[in-house]
Amino acid sequence: MKSARVVFKGGIPFSPEFDDVYFNADDPIGQSEYVFNSVFDEIWEKKSEFNVLETGFGAGLNFLCAFKRFKNSDKFLNFVSIEKTPITRDDLAKIYANFSELADVSGELLDAYPPLIRGFHRLNLAPNVTLTLCFGDVAEVLDELSFSADAVFMDGFAPAKNEAMWSERVCGKIANLCAFGASVCTYSASGALKRALQNSGFEVNLLKGYGKKREMLRAKFAGERQARSEIWFSRFDPAGMTAPKSALIIGGGVAGCVCAFKLRERGLDVTIAEKRSDIALNGSGNHCGILMPLITKPSVNLGRMHMNAFLQAARFYGQNLGAQEIEFCGATDYAYEQKTLERFYEWREFDADNGVFELKFEGEPYASAFIFSGAKARPRKMCKAASAGIKTLLNCEFTGFETLEGGAVRAHFKDGQSIDADVLVLAVGSESMELFADYDIRLSSVRGQVTHIEPAVRTSAPFSAKGYVCPPVGGVQVIGATYDRNLFLDEPRSSDDEKNLADVAEFLDGKFAKSERVNLSGEQDQNLTIGPDGDAKNADRLKTNNGSVNLNENTDNVEILRGAIADEKIISKFDDEPIDVASLANGENSSETKTVATSDKNSLTREFGEISPVSFAYETSAEKCASSEHPLGVKFINQIKTVNKNLPDLAKNAGKADGFKSSNFTKISPLANLQRPMNAKDAVKIGKDAKFVSAGSAEFLDSSNLDKRAESLNLTSLKRRTDRLNLLNLTENKDADGSAQTYDAPNSATPENLLNAATKTPPNIRIIGSKVGYRSYSGDRFPLIGRLYDEDFYKDAYKSLLWTKNRPNPSPKYVPNVYASTAHGSRGLCTAVLGAELVCDLIFDRPLCIEKSLFDELHLARFLVRKLKKGLR
């Protein structure tokens, strides 16, 4: 956004745009204390917490004087300041160099000063002092605020130089944010301002001005605030409530731990209750992750929310955690698809110099955004650090709560114990769906699997494209992550590892072991999954003599071959005999080769986008299939090419197998389709001697163009077939001396370059293990943050919203002292901090750290309200 142009005249900052100085040249600190901060003397003994609204942050002297007053006190200050053209950090540093008496507080402000990007910026400068800087037009920002101010500082440039800031319209918006009796302080004695304040419900007095100024205005709010239009999202009025002293957090993930940290910092006695044997064992338990925002088009609310959450998270983690937990090395977001590129272009026009990220359109392999405060994060370590010293109850499964007389909450647990607390915060992440089953809230649990590999990508900072890659930590590099909505499978799957590798294929490099290869074509390479993979932490997958991986040590000879197939000379062998690729390509019957059936194409498209067909071939007989004891789960199959005339017999016999329904085969033809993926519960039974090979999802090559003398393929010399089944090199290539060849990715890695290089000698990636976790996702991609609403009241009071949404409605009703905070999805490290901060804002009746329009997007009742507005119940 546009920053202020500051010219220094005799050491005093001057604005050429408004032709005015930023503060009194004679005694700026004295003026600030006399005109503005003296208001605290009038109300100091009446309150323990003060909310201040300022129009015109300028050089920040009013705030710094207030900060200095509160810093070592037992009072709390929540200061909100609006600025349309903020001064840069460098210019502020020049200004503060002349105020040695403010050095202790100005240094803290400079350290936390945000990038100059439109929106709200919450700075927690001390346990009892928050500053919310709101960059934007004063009238627009006032509409986005939601709190009751005890004092208002009107300190813009002179009314004659900046009329819009002192208008009656602005005064009316200020009045709607004032508590009854709130004071308005200003150096101005303008007659127009006096009338504007009076017309807005203020009682106005003239007082002696400071220094050479004869008079100044002081006003008190004596009117009534207008109810907001969408009253169903209004905040709870805590008038008369006793300040809480204790809090119980349900959930030991990042959302719960950060919330516990912040509530303890406010002086509450905090307890965490976690159902598992330790904290951070679910979605917050990854070895490594990325702290970065979701970049959408600038005006999209989802992106605005994520930008706010990211900036808060970067400040919080930077202030409170160490290098062992998080390393601010920057992060890169690649525009691997057109819609991301379009977002970057729009940001370039809107606010390219935003201070959060730098756009680069000429880079390889894609255009990118480098996020300056992006970080390599250690989520589990972060949870441990944030919860250090906080009482934590493990193996403590929450079952429900009841409200007690006086507003306290009693939580009940599966083992029969109960815990009472003044505040209950539900931070259960992926289990929110079950917890809020009785509420009109659209939630789902998403299974995500990350893959741990030996270091393979040379990078000192994390990055994200279709997948993401973290720098190696402790000899382990994390890539990820899969996304399976409402799939509950704790065991890692090799097919997910393959997908993770395929999603970052264009970035893979290095010299790796020969046992496990990856398709570098840049396309999906989903493979057959045979039974459970087993616990990935026991990196003891059985290797076979042909380089494949046995996924289940209890299943002899049932194998998955990673990667994809090339020509028949280098196909992985069945009993030392190669598969006849020519017959596969031509659709002819190949001896002892059968085809397994398919999952619903539409579901695949929804989950993965458009993917190429996948072919599975295996050597077995229908009799063995029908009599087998070993399950086969088939997923990620889109279309298959029938390669054996005996498929009808196979399907017929397979239908007799225990646990498999022949009706799953809806037709037996050259293209056999299933209505849904098979899994372990309705799987085909395959014999012990069955061996499998996945052809991957690359492009099937015309065997007539294969160079049968070569040990590797050159795709540029091959004619593409119309059936679009792309087969790449699977088996090991060796040099003349018999040693395995290695592969180094070029510095200028593009999908095309990598494809060509990969078909010469694809690299080997050694998978160390995998980690499965579950995350919470809402139906609209916003997290659930806020006070738990009274479902019955909403359905009754707002049942006629279809007709009355523009008429007066009753104020909402909430469940006393129960809050929710979900660390949402892949940006959970960011939204966890946003959630914790908002919960504190609501508990302590502070100004919100985010725009009101964005807070409404997080409200737990939003899904119900949308239904009621449509006349639904």
Report residues per predicted region.
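Glycine-rich FAD pyrophosphate-binding loop
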Residues: 266-284
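Flavin-binding catalytic cores
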Residues: 488-519, 643, 722, 743-774, ...
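C-terminal catalytic lobe of FAD-dependent flavoproteins
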Residues: 514-518, 763-873
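A conserved short coil-to-beta-strand element within the FAD-binding core of flavoproteins
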Residues: 394-409
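N-terminal Rossmann-like FAD-binding beta1-loop-alpha1 element of flavoenzymes
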Residues: 245-271
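Dinucleotide-binding Rossmann-like beta1-alpha1 core, especially the glycine-rich loop
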Residues: 288-366, 766, 775
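Central helical "cap/lid" subdomain
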Residues: 280, 418-464, 493, 510, ...
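Helix-loop-beta segment of a Rossmann-like dinucleotide-binding subdomain
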Residues: 103-106, 297-300, 323-333, 356-387, ...
